[in-house]
Amino acid sequence: MTVDNSQIPNLNQPESFADLWDGYENVSKATEKGVLLLKDITKFFKKRIQSEDEYSKTLSKLVLKFEPMAPDGYIGPRLKNTWDQIKLETLTHSNHHENICNNISTHIIEPIEGLIVDLEQKMKSIHVDAEKSFIHYQESVAKLKKAKQNYDRLCKDSFEITGVSKGETQKVQKRAIKAAQDVIKADKDYRAQINETNTSQKQFLTELIPKIMNDLQRLEMVRIHMVKSYFHRYFKSMESTPQKFNTETENLLNLINSINNEDEIQDFVRKSKTTHKYPKPFEYEPYLDRFTTPPPPPPPQISSPQLLSPRGDISIQHSSSSNSLPIFPTQHQLLSNKEKADNNITNSLSLSSDSLQTNLNNGNNGGNGNNGSNTPTKEKKPSSWGLKRFSTSVSSTSDRKLLNKQIQSIGLAHNGGNIFNCKIEDIMVAQKKKYPYLEIPFIVVFLKHKLVALDVFKTQGIFRVPGNVVDINSLKKRFDEGNYEVAPTENVYTIASLLKLWLREITEPLFPLTVYDQCIENSNKREKIFEIISSLPILNQKTISYIIELLQECGKSVNVEHNKMNFPNLAMVFSPCFLRCSHTDPNILLGNIFKEKEFVQNIIEHFKPLQVNDSLEGPPSSSSSSSTSINQSSIESPPTSPLRSSTNSNANKSSTPIKPSSPSQQQQQQQQQQQSSTPSTPLSSTTNTNVKHNILSPIVEQQSPNNGKQPIALTQTYSHLNIGSVPLIINTVNNNNQNQNQNQNQNQNQDQNQNQSKQPIQSSNQTQQQVSAPATPHTVAVNPKINQIKAETITTPQKSIGDGNGLIGQSPSAHLMSPSEVKRRSNAIYLEDQERCKQRIDELHTQVNELYSDITTIETTTYFAMQSSLLITKLTKSLESFLTIDMWNLTLQDIKEAIEKNKFVSPPPINFKIPSKMPKLSPIELVQNEQSSELLRSWLSNVTLTVNRINEYLCYLGGVVIRIHSPDTLFAISNLFTDYDLSPQQNPKFVSLTLEQSTIFIQKTLALLEPLNPFTSDELNINVKVQDTITPASFSPALISDPDCNSPPTISNTTNRLLNTSGSTDFSTTPLSSSPSTSSTSLSTNNNNNNNGNRNLDINNSPTIVITNSSLNKSALSTNNNNNNNNNNNNNPTTKLSSSTSSTSTTTTTNTNTNTTTNEKIAHAIISPSSSTTSFKFDDDEDEDEDLLEINNKLHSQLTEELKKKQQQYKQLIFDIIDMIKDKKKLMNSLDLTNSDSQLDIKSIAKLSLSLKRALDNFTSESGFDIEDEQDPIINKENDSFVNLKIMTSHFISRIVLILTTILSISNEFNSTLYQLLLPFNENNNNNNENNNINNQ
């Protein structure tokens, strides 16, 4: 009996969407939901930006507009300093939330919106291709249907004519001949159409569907990978947040790092994969006359379980030979043949198409004699892209419906293997055929070992914390359907809840209702409890023992430290699972709770479990205990339902396990084996295709009688084998411990004596060979499943084979396996090293591509560009030497084929086109000079090809790392990236190179950029050969660089109503700093009709102002009384201010109406610029002059008021600038990037922001303000240039707000330089607002 290899899953090959050949509709819906998820993410983060922005503004206004009642003068300078720091911390908190808004917009919202557009376009293209493929297949099936109908019609006519032709006229005979000829022709057409349809079906299933599914998988891989990278970059940018946010950020980073697009795909495939097999090819169905049939014989006895198919249908076997069949089949034979035909095409496909459905329904009547009408069935509207199960049978569906009705009428419809809500005895009967030696329900064994695999004993709150209800119901449904596929990363709480659910839902509890009262009465009596257990059926006793053993291990003190579940806690949880009260009185129910707990607790603490055989394929061996060991490893792979049986009786016979021999026979065989001079050789690593060596294989239904094997218990473990690095045959037995292992080898030797000796595999592509020499008596065969995994190759051709010790020196092709298989075989340390190595590969991939984009698109120095290209080349050569020379002797073509074959996409193998634009390197003469420009083109070509090559290498290594289990190989790959830094070193000596120096530098660099292996023609022709490769796109400073970049921009009139700004101002005339003031100080007060706007008050940094009569007489202080000018004092408060970096000068406007006739006394007016107090001292040799004192007092009060007014204007100006620049940002975010006017507006806002930022940067550097370092935003090179311009402008605005708020928080004193710097921007904004108001009116 052979096994269809196409249906046997290859554990080495990672599962993909191509395995879901009948799941296009499911995958398509899942991909659409993935796009909806991206939209949900953007919607959520947009709302979060609004909240963060509002909160940031509220905190900023609280600090900046807070008016203290005690600004100064109170006791406690340290308290004042502390209070200032608290306000500054609040401002820092506000800036933090502002930074969050910027990071979310830059790193999440904008990239994901672009990704959504790209995914939707590509999904639309895939759907169009899928629809074409489906329609083509539909047409082929419709043609076959038509040919079948024509054949059946002609056959029917021929039979009718033949029946009346005897003894009739010659005309009737000619009609019969003509009808026979038509039948022959129709028969040929029918057969030809079958071949054509089968060809179309084969192409559809093996080429078109896999391509479509692979395209969808590629989109999903990209989506998950890109979203992960966006999240990662966002939270990486938040690492500089305050310490109180670090914990949450670190946890989120760990969760993000745990995202693996390949694991996500594997989990989806595992949950979506059905047990349907490929539909069999269309078969020729001869015409059967359904009209002339005698009455059917009595129905056969179908009580035998062999008559039930795995899907619950009836498989009726007819015992009559072909010779005894009548000419026309009976109704029963028709039913049997029809059922067989249906079984042959079970698990087939069906297309949801209007045309096909109509054809199928309308054509059914041609071959159905029970219904002569041609009434079509009601059409059903198909789904958009629904590829459902479609049938390869073109016969009528009414026969199947009739058969199903007959099955239901006689009560034979099977429920498909329900294991919940049924009796435990029924489960044992149903699974007896597949697992005859299993003493307890299979579901208990499976769940227990799954719990052990998920480290149940170290899980806090296990059995107490409930699992996810949706996941529990999903697993329950799948288990009832016979699908035991469970993800390796399934939540342990879900599995634990499923075990409790099964115990609660079985029809009769393990302690039946008849003994419930006894259990309650003797809850504290151990002997009585043990008697009650011994009185139970043996099946109940062993099931209880199997579960109690798990609970006892869980309640050990060593494990309780971690899971917090001691015996009382476990008893409280499991008492409702073991006992059920039949009473409905709430008082009785509540009163029995503690007694139930006490009863179960006594069982867990003191009951000694019985020995239970959990072997799936044979009785327990004599050398091992039949009781289950908790600490042994879990199930190798998910099994199928034990309730499913084979449809073929022969298959059932072949799947019957080998009966154990008697003890005497075993002793005789053992003695013969010990006396034999030629011991049996180990099993070959290549397995027979007729045998599936998986302990719990989903397809283990048949086993060749020539390949018997030792019954393997579920708890058997192979954790001592290092699959990736050990030879296929392991010497584990020596002369000292040979006797200890005799019992373990006994059953293997019994089976091996029946087979020919086989030698181990010598290479990955060899087949089974005969052993020329006997093996040593110390060789022990590796598990056949492991041999099968190791023997199969799935990837790159093996260039050379090393010494066989691991992967060192040989290609990893023979050892690649699915990531889930690697995780299952690995311990925590190996997985941690693997994750660290994979993360390092991803980081280097990101750094290389970002560095390449920087040196080819952003303005930089020649030295920086050359150093960066040398670093990239050095890393490339290191990887190239490792892959092509030192390690595996691969070629670049081998690597590309491996990437394509195994679908390596993490990190993605990006290929850049060679840019057509020259890089922006300084000096700019490089591009203008002919010689240097040619050198630059050669350098640009070499760097691009090198980056493409290193992307291929990193993609290959990233895929290999997660698919191998070899510590040596992982260590060798990790050493490649140890302490490797891709950050170019800056050297101030080479910042300003001349044209000649730069040319020489490029020449020397070019000589070092040559790869180890020359570039191939495909690589050199990358621009021609690959049309959809990536070109590095980034933010272009040219969009906002103008000669007058320091001047505010002119914004288009189209959006003046939105911008509230128009016109332009030339800021080149605005002085950013004034000349230093002289040592003398003059206080001037002028009242003049012609100079009302030029009243200046200059105060030097000197702490005193000396006012004397002589200075007054010399007009050092001049006061002109003019009452006519009093009304003009406040007409023009704007004053031209000047200051220097070394002194503080204050300019104000003062108007006095004071009589200056008394100039006889000398007065020293001491005014402190940092305080509002003023004291006057008069010379001792002069008399006090009250008039002069009054003048000075009034002057001081006026100066103080003007200073306060200027401080208010100064603060208000900063607030206005902050509000203005934030409004510009809101406006920019609301503009449509595709509109030309909006693009002009964005450029204008960018110019304004850049000019203001540069001015503030110069001011802070000259004034010595301590502003936190600027961090350049991360630019996505694939974005549009205006998208990147928008990102940079947002960064400029955030920097402006940060500088202004920090300056204001450090010092509230009036600063004339900053005032002069900001005033033109504010005036320009006010003028634009006025113009807009006029235009609107």
From Swiss-Prot:
InterPro entries: AH/BAR_dom_sf, F_BAR, FCH_dom, Rho_GTPase_activation_prot, RhoGAP_dom. Residues 293-302 have a biased composition (Pro residues). Residues 621-637, 645-687, 734-772, 1064-1102, 1114-1159 have a biased composition (Low complexity). Keywords: Coiled coil, Cytoplasm, GTPase activation, Vacuole. GO terms for biological process: signal transduction. GO terms for molecular function: GTPase activator activity. Residues 279-328, 345-392, 612-689, 733-781, 794-821, 1041-1102, 1114-1166 are annotated as: Disordered. It is found in: Cytoplasm; Contractile vacuole. Residues 345-358, 1047-1063 have a biased composition (Polar residues). Residues 14-264 form the F-BAR domain. The record marks 464 as: Arginine finger. GO terms for cellular component: contractile vacuole; cytoplasm. Residues 422-611 form the Rho-GAP domain. Residues 830-859, 1189-1219 form a coiled coil. Rho GTPase-activating protein involved in the signal transduction pathway. This is GTPase activating protein homolog 3. It comes from Dictyostelium discoideum (Social amoeba).
